[in-house]
Swiss-Prot record:
PANTHER family: ATP-DEPENDENT CLP PROTEASE ATP-BINDING SUBUNIT CLPX-LIKE, MITOCHONDRIAL, ATP-DEPENDENT CLP PROTEASE ATP-BINDING SUBUNIT CLPX-LIKE, MITOCHONDRIAL-RELATED. ATP binds at P121, T122, G123, C124, G125, K126, T127, L128. One of its GO terms (biological process) is cell division. One of its GO terms (cellular component) is HslUV protease complex. It comes from Mesorhizobium japonicum (strain LMG 29417 / CECT 9101 / MAFF 303099) (Mesorhizobium loti (strain MAFF 303099)). ATP-dependent specificity component of the Clp protease. It directs the protease to specific substrates. Can perform chaperone functions in the absence of ClpP. Keywords: ATP-binding, Chaperone, Metal-binding, Nucleotide-binding, Zinc. One of its GO terms (molecular function) is zinc ion binding. This is ATP-dependent Clp protease ATP-binding subunit ClpX. The keyword Glycoprotein does not apply. Zn(2+) binds at C17, C20, C39, C42. The lineage of its organism: Bacteria, Pseudomonadati, Pseudomonadota, Alphaproteobacteria, Hyphomicrobiales. Belongs to the ClpX chaperone family. Residues 5-58 form the ClpX-type ZB domain.
């Protein structure tokens, strides 16, 4: 039932949302039903919940294995661009669980596991792809940072901690954990530090690669129950990693130079045309990667062999960055518009302003990751001044504001009323 205030004559007829308790003055719209009321904010929340449930149920197909098309469709809702990488991930995840669904039915051919390596410049969506997969695939999922890993016995995390995190995400259900997905980020940071053997042991580089080999290929890892340190007296949980899918991702800074150098050597001679690395985008160069380039970068041959599926991601171009700014559910423009709504102010971006923001991100070579810092710099003064100003109803951001040659345009309530009267 809706609540009716009894404190004063003004509040006697005030209506309240039956779900969140907000009054009709705190929301834009209050919809009346038989003896109940619901506000526009609660309606939006209900619609979001229904949409999420529809997306989750959509990826359920025959035998419980989502088809590649179904996985791709959900990835497209959250991740802009990268069609090739999304297709590779969709097929790999589908095949992985199809293999598990048919395990033991026909033993004449044993299907090997295909772990995945994602290579792409910074800010192109590698981590977001993995996080989105976690949201749409109903299996335990964990993310690990390769920079924190060291060999067992040294200060830092050992590789078995990854399996422990996966087990925790499965609520210590070993059967479910053994069908999970592990994403290891910053995998390029564990490359061999140099070609020359050193007196000091490389515990965070080649040593970690060696330690990861076993769990990626398939081994029975001993994990302490409910976390904590290992003690000789305690019983361990045995987790078989043979059916855990490993996805590794990294920016591989400098790999483009290795690939370009190899291209130059193979293009020597009269009439050979070699494009300068400066004339080609990093994503285009990465597409020509070969296993030998990864070996030169510092990955050991056995480790490269454990990652047979290779997907390269492209640099995000201007249209893709504009889409990222405006289209996803949690798009940056929508986030800042919601912030300004809290001050009862509309925030408007001209199309050429969004284009200028995207161009600046491309110049900085930070990809989508750099968009937030650019937006913060543009709106800093406005967000500082706005709470103390009265009567502002709209803030307009033009291309000149992004380039720094003008200030944001403030439109006051009187001006808005005049505009409305003129158009009427």
């Amino acid at each position: 039932m809706s609540k009716v205030g009894n404190n004063s004559g003004d509040s006697k007829n005030t209506l309240y949302c039956s779900f969140c308790g907000k009054s009709q003055h705190e929301v834009r719209k209050l919809i009346a039903g038989p003896t109940v009321f619901i506000c526009d904010e609660c309606v939006e929340l209900c619609m979001d919940i229904i949409r999420e449930e529809n997306k989750t149920s959509m990826v359920k197909s025959r035998e419980g294995v989502p088809t590649p098309q179904e996985i791709l469709k959900v990835l497209d809702d959250y991740v802009i661009g990268q069609p090739y990488a999304k297709r590779v991930l969709s097929v790999a995840v589908h095949n992985h669980y199809k293999r598990l669904a048919h395990a033991g039915k026909n033993n004449d051919v044993e299907l090997a596991k295909s772990n995945i390596l994602l290579i792409g410049p910074t800010g192109c969506g590698k981590t977001l792809l993995a996080q989105t997969l976690a949201r749409i695939i109903d299996v335990p999922f964990t993310m690990a940072d390769a920079t924190t890993l060291t060999e067992a016995g040294y200060v830092g995390e050992d590789v078995e901690n990854i399996i422990l995190k996966l087990l925790q995400s499965a609520d210590y259900n070993v059967e479910r954990a053994q069908r999970g997905i592990v994403y290891i980020d910053e995998i390029d940071k564990i490359s061999r530090k140099s070609d020359n053997p050193s007196i000091t042991r490389d515990v965070s580089g080649e040593g970690v690669q060696q330690a990861l080999l076993k769990i990626m290929e398939g081994t029975v890892a001993s994990v302490p129950p409910q976390g904590g340190r290992k003690h000789p007296q305690q019983e361990f949980l045995q987790v078989d990693t043979a059916n855990i899918l490993f996805i590794c991702g990294g920016a591989f800074a400098g790999l483009d130079k290795i690939i370009s150098d190899r291209g130059r050597k193979t293009s020597i001679g009269f009439g050979a045309t070699v494009a300068s690395p400066e004339d080609r985008r990093t994503g285009d160069i990465f597409r020509q990667v070969e296993p030998e380039d990864l070996l030169k970068f510092g990955l050991i041959p056995e480790f490269v062999g454990r990652l047979p599926v290779l997907a390269t991601l492209e640099d995000l171009d201007e249209p893709a960055l504009i889409q990222i700014l405006t289209e996803p559910k949690n798009a940056l423009v929508k986030q800042y518009q919601r912030l300004f709504e809290m001050e009862n102010v509309d925030l408007t971006f001209h199309e050429n302003a969004l284009s200028a923001i995207a161009k600046r991100a491309i110049e900085r070579k930070t990809g989508a990751r750099g968009l937030r810092s650019i937006m913060e710099a543009i709106l800093l003064d406005t967000m500082f001044e706005l709470p103390a100003l009265e009567g502002v109803r709209e803030v307009v951001i033009s291309e000149e504001v992004v380039t720094g040659s003008a200030r944001p345009l403030y439109i006051y309530s009187e001006q808005k009323e005049k505009k409305g009267n003129v158009s009427a």
